[in-house]
């Protein structure tokens, strides 16, 4: 990515209502804070996803990211934000038949699951080698 040889595109693919709320919350952050919020969501997922009231815990995570409880509530109730996240999810499902997360798409080829970095690097290196030959 840093060399400009690879482009990374992150797309939300919520598999349940809680993941949907998290994706919606990130979308409601200011544009320049989107990826820092996503990092906080994923980095603290074990802390909020498996508690008795995960929605309240997610709201607390929002506070860490600078999203007030009022903004969080308005965001997760916003039909436009909901429709936007679901469109991205549904497009990924239709085009790539995504069934789980994480899923990566490299040159239109779907790669399912969490790969060790060495294996993922091999996939990327092979695709970069193909691109050089063109």
Q: What is each PLM-predicted segment?
A:
Residues 1-63:
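Structural alpha/beta surface segment adjacent to cysteine/selenocysteine redox centers
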Residues 60-134:
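C-terminal cap of thioredoxin/glutaredoxin-like
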């Amino acid at each position: 990515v840093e060399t400009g040889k690879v482009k990374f595109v992150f797309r939300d693919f919520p598999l349940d209502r809680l993941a949907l709320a998290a994706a919606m919350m990130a979308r409601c952050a200011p544009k320049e804070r989107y990826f820092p919020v996503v990092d906080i969501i994923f980095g603290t997922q074990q802390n909020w996803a498996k508690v008795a009231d995960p929605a309240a815990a997610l709201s607390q995570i929002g506070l860490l990211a600078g999203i007030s409880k009022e903004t969080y509530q308005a965001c997760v109730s916003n039909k436009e934000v909901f429709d936007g996240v679901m469109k991205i999810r549904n497009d990924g499902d239709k085009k790539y038949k995504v069934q789980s997360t994480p899923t990566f798409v490299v040159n239109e080829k779907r790669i399912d699951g969490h790969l060790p970095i060495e294996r993922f690097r091999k996939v990327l290196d092979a695709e970069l080698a193909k691109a050089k030959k063109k």
